[in-house]
Design a protein with these regions (language model features):
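Catalytic alpha/beta core domains of metabolic enzymes, predominantly
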Residues: 6-10, 16-96
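Flexible C-terminal active-site loop/helix
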Residues: 73-125
Length: 125
């Protein structure tokens, strides 16, 4: 584990695999200064404040040369569903939050092996 306050060391090492910023990035304001340290950014709607900021953050991150990962916290499919808009253009997707719950909402995201599919329209009520 590397604490976000100590991630400056990443700028000095060669990385044969992509290193993704997670705790070091929360919104567009936190993107600056991370390009030399990370190859990708993990966008979580819970941390960005919602879909609008997450979409803007993805656009800005791509413009800066970052690869995009879409992640999540533990939550129901209702919380995950908006992230599917980002997932379609992300290189890495980790939307497994509903799988960690004892019971998810009806008509939520559908999982088949390593694939995740959008929810039924009835999820929205």
């Amino acid at each position: 584990m590397l604490f976000r306050s100590r991630d400056e060391a990443l700028a000095r090492i060669r990385r044969p695999v992509a290193v993704c910023a997670d705790e070091s990035v929360h919104d567009r304001a936190t993107l600056s200064g991370l390009r030399e340290r990370y190859d990708a950014v993990n966008i979580k709607l819970d941390k960005t404040g919602g879909l609008t900021e997450a979409l803007a953050m993805a656009d800005e991150a791509r413009a800066l040369g970052f690869e995009i990962m879409v992640g999540c916290m533990v939550a129901t499919s209702l919380a995950m569903a908006p992230a599917m808009l980002l997932a379609s253009e992300a290189r890495f997707v980790d939307l497994d939050g509903p799988l960690l719950l004892k019971r998810d909402r009806e008509d939520g995201l559908r999982y088949d092996g390593s694939l995740v599919y959008p929810p039924e329209a009835s999820l929205w009520g």
